From Swiss-Prot:
The gene is pucA. Keywords: Antenna complex, Bacteriochlorophyll, Cell membrane, Chlorophyll, Chromophore, Light-harvesting polypeptide, Magnesium, Membrane, Metal-binding, Transmembrane, Transmembrane helix. Belongs to the antenna complex alpha subunit family. GO terms for molecular function: bacteriochlorophyll binding; electron transporter, transferring electrons within the cyclic electron transport pathway of photosynthesis activity; metal ion binding. Pfam families: LHC (PF00556). This is Light-harvesting protein B-800/850 alpha chain. Antenna complexes are light-harvesting systems, which transfer the excitation energy to the reaction centers. A bacteriochlorophyll binds at H31. An active antenna complex lacking the last 16 residues has also been isolated from DSM 149.
Length: 71
């Protein structure tokens, strides 16, 4: 590890959470930007055409209108 001496300046109890937090924030910003700027990424996360086809296949059949009683 070529940057091993950094822990002489920054305590690991501070540096590791800050580093992991920065990675998490970067990932959230990246994914948020992809969702906001593209139309395919949200569909990819939702299953795309497969999910739409499955939802259409599971849709309930239409119900017939009630008939007026015969007099």
């Amino acid at each position: 590890m070529n940057q091993g001496k950094v822990w002489r300046v920054v305590k690991p109890t501070v540096g590791v959470p800050v580093y992991l937090g920065a990675v998490a924030v970067t990932a959230l910003i990246l994914h948020g930007g992809l969702l906001a700027k593209t139309d395919w990424f949200g569909a990819y996360w939702n299953g795309g055409k497969k999910a739409a086809a499955a939802a259409a296949a599971v849709a309930p059949a239409p119900v017939a209108a009630p008939q007026a009683p015969a007099q």
